[in-house]
From Swiss-Prot:
It comes from Streptomyces avermitilis (strain ATCC 31267 / DSM 46492 / JCM 5070 / NBRC 14893 / NCIMB 12804 / NRRL 8165 / MA-4680). The active site is at 31 (proton acceptor), 109 (proton donor). Homododecamer. Its EC number is 4.2.1.10. It comes from the Bacteria. Pathway: Metabolic intermediate biosynthesis; chorismate biosynthesis; chorismate from D-erythrose 4-phosphate and phosphoenolpyruvate: step 3/7. This is 3-dehydroquinate dehydratase. NCBIfam families: aroQ, PRK05395.1-2, PRK05395.1-3, PRK05395.1-4.
Length: 159
């Protein structure tokens, strides 16, 4: 059955993992001074440029993120996810994302995870993501929204 969700009738789910509620306060030398509210405004502006909206959420709890992914597969046009530390540990989040057949998923990281500690170099989420954006600061979220919008509009990976 073809997907009937479009940017005009379904939001992009933006999911933020643990400790991102402290964005702007925690390690500003790595993550910058922008707050999560600033990131939400940036994402909303990027989606609006494509006639879309965002459903922006943050949780420090893996199970809640999994529940939201399950919700997104039914009611959203795509997912932008910053799984934060769960990138490197959560098979549960990967498994949830793998249930989202045909739904564009873009992983975003504020810092370049490949320039950080060795344990941060691997991401389980990347195994499902249609794209990964890292090291672009909070602007990476806007890039991720742009990519999800392009994939949602065309349904093509080369969009």
């Amino acid at each position: 059955m073809p997907r009937t969700r479009t940017l005009a009738n379904a939001p992009i789910m933006i999911l933020n993992g643990p400790n991102l509620n402290l964005l702007g306060q925690r390690q500003p030398e790595i993550y910058g001074s922008d707050t999560l509210a600033d990131v939400e405004a940036l994402c909303a502006k990027a989606a609006a440029a494509h006639g879309g909206t965002v459903d922006f959420r943050q949780s420090n709890h893996e199970g809640e993120l999994v529940d939201w992914i399950h919700e997104a597969r039914l009611h959203h046009v795509g997912i932008v996810i910053n799984p934060a530390a769960y990138s490197h540990t959560s098979v549960a989040i990967l498994d949830a994302l793998n249930t989202c057949d045909g739904l564009p998923v873009v992983e975003v990281h504020i810092s370049n995870i490949h320039q950080r500690e060795e344990f941060r170099h691997h991401s389980y989420v990347s195994l499902r993501a249609d794209g990964v954006i890292a090291g672009c600061g909070v602007q990476g979220y806007a890039f991720a929204v742009e990519r999800v919008a392009a994939l949602a509009e065309t349904g093509r990976a080369d969009a």
